[in-house]
């Protein structure tokens, strides 16, 4: 053991440091008024720039959409016109077939027909059939000179028998 006596407890010297409940806080910075105004103006400028960019993007998208809609409307109108013309052509063909136009003359007859609806096309077909005289008539049988004169005597090419035949046909005595 040691020669010196020690007292029980804490050794003599520094007392225990005092513990505080608050941690060390940094000291708050203080900004002057001009610096704060500058920061606010920068933030406002950024907000305005973003707002302008969004408005420009929306306007560009709307313009593109409007152009696309206009192109579609134009194409739809063109298709409707083509469909209308095809319907008129079909109606003319049906009217021609109903009028019993011969198949080799149907397309020529369709070109003659006028009108935009079924009634006007039918009326045009009726008028044109009356003008043409219809297609139901059969052709007149042709004269075949090789078949003779039906029992009559052949006329000489010169002389009085020709004159007499002409007088008989014309009724001159």
Curated annotation (Swiss-Prot):
Residues 1-30 are annotated as: Disordered. Residues 36-56 form a coiled coil. It comes from the Viruses. Keywords: Coiled coil, Viral capsid assembly, Viral release from host cell. Belongs to the L5likevirus scaffolding protein family. Scaffolding protein involved in the icosahedric procapsid assembly. Coassembles with the capsid proteins to form the procapsid, in which the scaffolding protein is found within the external shell of icosahedrally arranged capsid protein subunits. This is Probable capsid assembly scaffolding protein. It comes from Mycobacterium phage D29.
